[in-house]
Structure formats: C-alpha cells, structure tokens
C-alpha cells in the first residue's frame, strides 16, 4: 500500500511531526510519499492530511479525482471534519 502525507511544512513543529510519521510508516513497510500541496495528490492509495478543516476540504477534490482515500488528523483549530 502506498501512503501519502500532506501537511503544512512552514512550521518547524509540523515538519518534525510529518518526518516522524513518514519514518514510522516506512518502518512498518509502507511506501510513502510526501506532498506539499493538495494538487500533488496522486499515485497513492491513501493520503494522510495533517491540518484543519480547510486542509481536508482543499484535499478532497484532488484526492477524489485520483481515487485516493483521505485520513484526516486534526492539526488546526476547529477539527470538525477530523472528529
């Protein structure tokens, strides 16, 4: 299974979390790919989106076009969609 990871890497803490998540997934034997923008989502079975509701919403259309499932992890303020 190929897993993509998408999150805002403009913050140092976010980059650290993304790096740790990718390392963990690879240690379990998953092929991983990091994305920096929703438009890049393709070539994976699932994308893990770290962010708030806006990140999930922006990722929905590109993911759907490429038949990619979304797993959301709330890293924002509201988190309604990741609840």
Predicted feature descriptions by range:
Residues 36-83:
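Small-residue-rich beta-alpha loop regions that form the catalytic core of phosphotransfer
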């Amino acid at each position: 299974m190929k897993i993509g990871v998408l999150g805002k890497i403009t913050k140092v803490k976010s980059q650290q979390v993304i790096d740790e998540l990718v390392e963990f997934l690879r240690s379990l034997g998953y092929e991983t790919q990091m994305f920096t923008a929703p438009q890049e989502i393709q070539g994976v079975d699932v994308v893990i989106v770290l962010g708030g509701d806006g990140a999930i919403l922006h990722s929905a259309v590109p993911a759907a076009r490429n038949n990619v499932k979304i797993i959301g992890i709330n890293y924002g303020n509201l988190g309604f969609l990741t609840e």
